[in-house]
Structures are given as structure tokens and as C-alpha cells.
Amino acid sequence: MPLYIHALACAFGLGSWVSINGLWVELPLIVNVLPEGWDLPSYLTVIIQFANLGPLLVTLAHKFCPGRLRENLAIYAVLSIGVVACILLAVFWNYTTVIFGQPRSTAFFILTFFLALVDCTSSVTFLPFMMQLPAKYITTYFIGEGLSGLVPGLVALAQGVGMSKCVNVTNVSDNVTDPGPSTFIVETQYLPPNFSTEIFFSFLAVMTTISLGAFLILNRLPRTFELSTENLVSDSDAVATVCRGLEDPMDPKTNCPEEVEQKQNEVLLPKPQHSSYQLAFIYVMVLWVNSATNGLLPSVQTFSCMPYGNMAYHLSAALSAVANPVACIIAMFFPKRSLVFLGILCLLGSTFGGYNMAMAAMSPCPLLQDTPLGDAIIVLSWVFFTGLLSYVKVMVGVILRDRSHSALVWCGAAVQTGSLLGSIIMFPLVNVYHLFKSGDICNTNCPL
């Protein structure tokens, strides 16, 4: 029976962020089809920030109507919406409508918003439900949550990416009386991947359905909830708790057993001491890291990677998705709380991010284009950028978690502020001022 519940807890956690993670790793195939092209990621970063309306509403409900919001019904709703949105996305993802004379991916954007709403809201509903189960199942839940980033990345690697080829196309005039000479142009054509985008989105729907099914069974299990240390998140799960991303700036789980136990023991357990300068450094680091990883760099990943080819972009997106949960696992087994060490990692990760941004600014003719070395460097740069800053995010969150509840609340606020600022800054630079230039593999002539 316990193994059965462990499997259910893992499957339940799998549905937390599988949809949005799946969208990001599928972008290398989508940007070649949808009219927004290379600008598409900048739209997604803004849409995801708007989707934080979900956890905000849940937080306000807990604040002003304590005890009125039934979390099991909220979970039913968000997972059901996720399943329906994934199914609709598999059918309508490439449907466009004309807005102000330009084709726009309206269906894709609307469905992406609902998927982001589901995943963001899961951050403030799934864990409170899991707190009703014994603590040993919470670790398994976090494993499933980590798999929500790992599994789509691995499936995307298995899917592959449509390789591009340059094809000569003859254009013949439609004028019958005076046809004129034929013109020859070179077009970029993309070969199909191992399986289609529709199948990939259907896979996301299946994963979300599995999560919903696991929750249905977990919610019907008989359970007794006692106010004891067995039902608390253990110290070994501290990293895993923070690894969820600290999506909500205000913790809705008031009066939970963990908080009661913490208040009972706060006199016995000494809190870590940091000077005001150290705390300022920590919060600036949180602000910067989340701005870079959730807004600034994702908005220009296409411009950074696509000039090196579809394969480079595909590997960068998929391996970066894998690097995030791997960094969380490393943080669980090798936690380092030294601010000097974390500052060095932040600087190193930011250096890789700076290289990625520089290549995006140089698009469509970045350094070492059309060379195996250039392809390898850009892929590794994105992987190290994501992995290093993910480790920093987790460990900084752990430091603030051990300090106090209010410190963790301010950490969540810094996470959201940084992510929002990064998205807002990049959107006009990409879509209004067009500082980043897209290109075509077959028709872009770069100086030697």
C-alpha cells in the first residue's frame, strides 16, 4: 500500500509544471510555423506573468475568507482545465486570426494562458493538499514535481527537430498574356521530426490526465491528520520545498501544522544571523537571478540559438529544461550556503547569460556561426546558465526559509518582481523596437 501511494504522489506532482515546461521545449518546432516567429518566446514570458493572477486569487481567498476555499475542488478545477487546454492545443495550436492586418496566434496564446494559469496555481494548491498526508510522501511528490521538467525535456530529445534544407523554388508569373521570365528563389524547408507537435501536446494532455487521476485516488484515501512531527516537512525536504520556485509572494498556508510547530520551536532553534548588507545582497541576487532566468534570457533564446541552426536551439531548450531539476537534485545532496560561493556561482551563471544575450544581439550573424564549436558553445552556455542560476535560486531560498517566514514571503515577492521586470523590459525591445534581428538559414549572408 505505501508504494502504491508513493506512485500516486509522484504522478500527482508530475502535473505541476509539465505543461509550461513542455511548451518551452517544443518552441524550436513551433517558431518555424507560427507567424510571430522568433519573437514568440517574448510573448510567452509576458503571458506566464499574467497567469500569476491564479495564485494571487488563491492567496486573497485564504487571506480574506479563511477556511472557505476548498483546495481539493480548486485542484480538480485547475487540472481539468489543464487537460482540456492541452487537448485543444493539440488541435488548434497553429490556428491564426488576423488582428490589425497581421496574422496572430490567438488560439495558441489563449490556451497558453490557461496552461500557465494551471501551473502557477498548482504552486499554492498542490502542496497544502500534500500536507494532509504523512511527511514521507511529500518527498515523493517533490520527485514528481522535478520530473515535470525532466520528462518533457527527455521526450523532446526523443522527438528530435526538423532538420532544415535549402531548396530552389521557381516562381512563374500568373499573367497569361505576358508571363515574363521565371524567377528562382531559395527557400528554407524543414523536414518533419520523429513525431509531430500534435502528438507532443497530446502527450502533455496524457501527463496532466495521469496527474488528475492520481489526485482523484489520493483524495479518496482514508487518512488521519495529527499535529505531530510526522506530518511536517522534514529538514531533508527544505531544498525540495524551495525548489518549487517560491511562486507565491504571500504564503496562503496559514495556521498549518508546520507553522505551529515552527512557532513552538523558534525559541529552541537559533535562527541564522545575517547583517543588513548580507540580506540586501541576498534579495538583490534573488531579484536578478529570477529576472534573468524567467524574463530577460528566455525572451531572446530564439535569437541566441536559431542562427546556429534548429538542432542547436532544440538541444539548448531541451537540455536546459533537464538542467533545472538536475540542479535542484544537486542542491538537495550538496547544499552550500556560503554567500561568497553563491555569489561566485551567480556571477559565473550571469557570465554565461551575458554570452547568450550577446549572441542574441548579434543575430542573425553571431560568433562562430556554421561551426561545430559555435554550436557546442551556445548549447553548453544555455545549459550552464540555467543550471548554475537554478542552484543559486534554490540555496538562497533555503537560507531565507531557515531565517523566518516573513523572509520567505519577501523572497517570493522578489521572485515575482524580478520575473515581471525581466518580461516587461524585454517585450518592447523585441516586439516594438526590434533590437534583435531574425534571419533565414538559406538567405542570410553574414560577413566572414
From Swiss-Prot:
Primary location group: membrane
InterPro entries registered for this protein in UniProt: Riboflavin_transptr (IPR009357)
Any single Gene Ontology cellular-component annotation: plasma membrane
Glycosylation sites: N94, N168, N171, N175, N194
Keywords, in A-Z order: Cell membrane, Glycoprotein, Membrane, Transmembrane, Transmembrane helix, Transport
Coiled coil residues, start to end: none
Pfam families cross-referenced by the UniProt entry: SLC52_ribofla_tr (PF06237)
Gene Ontology MF term list: riboflavin transmembrane transporter activity
Membrane topology designation: Multi-pass membrane protein
Residue stretches spanning the membrane: 11-31, 40-60, 73-93, 107-127, 138-158, 198-218, 280-300, 315-335, 339-359, 376-396, 407-427
Subcellular location: Cell membrane
Reactions catalysed, as given in the entry: riboflavin(in) = riboflavin(out)
One biological process term in Gene Ontology: riboflavin transport
Family from the record: Belongs to the riboflavin transporter family.
Described purpose of this protein according to its UniProt entry: Plasma membrane transporter mediating the uptake by cells of the water soluble vitamin B2/riboflavin that plays a key role in biochemical oxidation-reduction reactions of the carbohydrate, lipid, and amino acid metabolism.
PANTHER family recorded: SOLUTE CARRIER FAMILY 52, SOLUTE CARRIER FAMILY 52, RIBOFLAVIN TRANSPORTER, MEMBER 3
Protein name in UniProt: Solute carrier family 52, riboflavin transporter, member 3-A
Organism: Danio rerio
